């Protein structure tokens, strides 16, 4: 009897120790995330301190990048990053929405799995493959056919004459934005497909029963029900586009001058760092570190805005 009681107390103590160890371990893992973010932020701040102390906040809008004279500014990479990322979103979001509608509402059962698998495979392709594909396929195609046609069609229109003008190099912001769009389509489409499938069938069946078309059901029933998930998927794609390096480096042109049109060669923050960091030293290396810090802050701001937008949508839905 005494031995059985002692054994029970020992088992209870062992369970308590295991539970305590489990709780502390998971707590450490959670804290480790914040420590990792703090470490990245600290290293970027210390690495960019020389550049910040030399140029101050003028680094943000200065458009010169001259290693010989040690004069650096971030506005050109910032503009290139934002233009290519938002251009990619403009192209990718409608296509992703169409793919998600097809997979959830229109595709026959035998076709849904192969198409879904193909989307997942596209998401798994390394970015350097997209970059090589863009350089050897898109660039000649754009240079010889697409860009000359766009210049001919839109060159005389008031607004489009600025967007589609200049020499048809093939490489440039437009090509980089298109390659980025192809890269982020699988991510956005997969998220939209998943959130569309959680809509209760009775809502869609009721709408169809009232005579609604597929477009009306998606626009007035499915999309309002899944707004939060759709916004999250779009922001996931934007975050992917902002930080993309290799694919953009292949096709953007890597030129440090402000773009005159969408066809102009330019550069992005990630491309500038990838091209120059290995050979940089002194103030140039510090300027590249500050570019990295700016990219870190941009992605943080985008993530924060997306979270606030999602919270606002959820709060508004809660009032209904």
From Swiss-Prot:
Record-level Gene Ontology MF annotations: phosphate transmembrane transporter activity
Membrane topology, Periplasmic segments: 51-80, 138-168, 253-287
Lineage: superkingdom: Bacteria
Keyword tRNA-binding: no
Residue ranges annotated as Cytoplasmic topological domain: 1-27, 104-114, 192-229, 311-320
CDD domains: TM_PBP2 (cd06261)
Key words of the record: Cell inner membrane, Cell membrane, Membrane, Phosphate transport, Transmembrane, Transmembrane helix, Transport
Biological processes annotated in GO: phosphate ion transport
GO cellular component, one term: plasma membrane
Compartments reported by the entry: Cell inner membrane
Alphabetical list of PROSITE patterns matching this protein: ABC_TM1
Topological type in the membrane: Multi-pass membrane protein
Domain ABC transmembrane type-1: 78-306
Listed InterPro entries: MetI-like (IPR000515), MetI-like_sf (IPR035906), Phosphate_PstC (IPR011864), Phosphate_Transport_Permease (IPR051124)
Bilayer-crossing regions: 28-50, 81-103, 115-137, 169-191, 230-252, 288-310
Its job: Part of the binding-protein-dependent transport system for phosphate; probably responsible for the translocation of the substrate across the membrane.
Family: Belongs to the binding-protein-dependent transport system permease family. CysTW subfamily.
UniProt protein name: Phosphate transport system permease protein PstC
Organism the protein comes from: Pasteurella multocida (strain Pm70)
């Amino acid at each position: 009897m005494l031995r059985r009681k002692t054994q029970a107390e020992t088992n209870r103590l062992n369970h308590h120790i295991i539970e305590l160890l489990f709780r502390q371990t998971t707590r450490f893992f959670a804290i480790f995330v914040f420590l990792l973010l703090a470490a990245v932020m600290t290293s970027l701040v210390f690495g960019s301190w020389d550049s910040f102390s030399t140029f101050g906040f003028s680094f943000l809008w200065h458009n010169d990048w001259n290693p010989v004279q040690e004069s650096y500014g971030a506005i050109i990479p910032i503009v290139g990053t934002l233009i290519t990322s938002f251009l990619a979103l403009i192209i990718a979001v409608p296509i992703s929405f169409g793919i998600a509608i097809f997979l959830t509402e229109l595709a026959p059962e035998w076709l849904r799995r192969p198409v879904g698998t193909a989307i997942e495979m596209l998401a798994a392709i390394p970015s350097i493959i997209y970059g090589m594909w863009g350089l050897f396929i898109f660039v000649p195609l754009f240079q010889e056919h697409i860009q000359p046609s766009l210049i001919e069609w839109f060159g005389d229109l008031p607004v489009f004459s600025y967007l589609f003008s200049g020499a048809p190099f093939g490489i440039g912001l437009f090509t980089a934005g298109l390659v980025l769009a192809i890269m982020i389509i699988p991510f956005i489409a997969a998220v939209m497909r998943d959130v569309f499938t959680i809509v209760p069938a009775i809502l869609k069946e009721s709408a169809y029963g009232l005579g609604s078309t597929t477009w009306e059901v998606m626009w007035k029933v499915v999309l309002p029900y899944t707004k939060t998930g759709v916004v999250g998927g779009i922001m996931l794609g934007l975050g992917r586009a902002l930080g993309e390096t290799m694919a953009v480096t292949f096709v953007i042109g890597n030129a440090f001058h402000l773009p005159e049109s969408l066809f102009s060669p330019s550069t992005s923050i990630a491309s500038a760092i990838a091209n120059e960091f290995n050979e940089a030293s002194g103030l140039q290396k510090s300027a590249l570190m500050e570019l990295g810090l700016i990219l870190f802050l941009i992605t943080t701001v985008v993530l924060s805005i997306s979270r606030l937008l999602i919270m606002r949508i959820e709060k508004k839905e809660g009032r209904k």
